[in-house]
From Swiss-Prot:
Record key words, sorted: Cell cycle, Cell division, Mitosis, Ubl conjugation pathway
Role: Component of the anaphase promoting complex/cyclosome (APC/C), a cell cycle-regulated E3 ubiquitin-protein ligase complex that controls progression through mitosis and the G1 phase of the cell cycle. The APC/C is thought to confer substrate specificity and, in the presence of ubiquitin-conjugating E2 enzymes, it catalyzes the formation of protein-ubiquitin conjugates that are subsequently degraded by the 26S proteasome.
Protein name as annotated: Anaphase-promoting complex subunit 13
Pfam families: Apc13p (PF05839)
Protein source organism: Schizosaccharomyces pombe (strain 972 / ATCC 24843)
GO biological process: anaphase-promoting complex-dependent catabolic process; cell division
Assembly, per entry: The APC/C is composed of at least 13 subunits: apc1, apc2, nuc2, apc4, apc5, cut9, apc8, apc10, apc11, hcn1, apc13, apc14 and apc15.
Gene Ontology CC entries for this record: anaphase-promoting complex; cytosol; nucleus
Statement: the UniProt record of this protein carries the keyword Cell cycle: yes
Keyword Cytoplasm tagged: no
InterPro entries xref list: Apc13
Chain segments annotated as transmembrane: none
Length: 135
């Protein structure tokens, strides 16, 4: 393999004379001939006829094929669904899931670790109302 790095063993004194030339030598850039069955598939962009409005047509087709992304990830519903599992404990260390749910059903949601992230997400969506998709 001529294109891979390798070590030169200086076991003969004449090798030193050619070492600098060997490091400077570059392989020529040649076209590699590949059989038809080994070629990659042709993309749609290469199959189309190139004319002045070809790029506009391709962009419009891509926009029509684009599926809209989710805007709402429904993280609040996810936190609400699993917040009662976490629960909280009272002074004796006993679990008081039922007590918390009866007094304030959203208390465990407010104490959930995802609450700050949900609040930041709400603020971000409010500031960027013109944003259409999450990327």
């Amino acid at each position: 393999m001529d294109s891979n790095y390798n070590y030169v063993h200086m076991n003969k004194p004449g090798v030193v004379l050619f070492a600098s030339d060997w490091l400077k030598d570059r392989l020529p850039v040649d076209d590699v001939e590949v059989r038809v069955e080994h070629l990659p598939p042709v993309t749609e962009d290469e199959m189309t006829i190139q004319h002045s409005s070809a790029n506009l047509i391709l962009m419009k087709n891509k926009q029509l094929r684009h599926e809209p992304a989710w805007k709402d990830l429904e993280l609040e519903d996810l936190v609400n669904a699993f917040a009662f599992i976490q629960g909280s404990s009272n002074a004796e260390g006993k679990n008081t899931i039922e007590d918390n749910f009866e007094t304030d059903p959203f208390k465990s949601v407010k104490e959930a670790p995802m609450a700050p992230f949900l609040e930041a997400n709400r603020r971000h969506q409010g500031e960027h109302a013109s944003m259409r998709y999450f990327r």
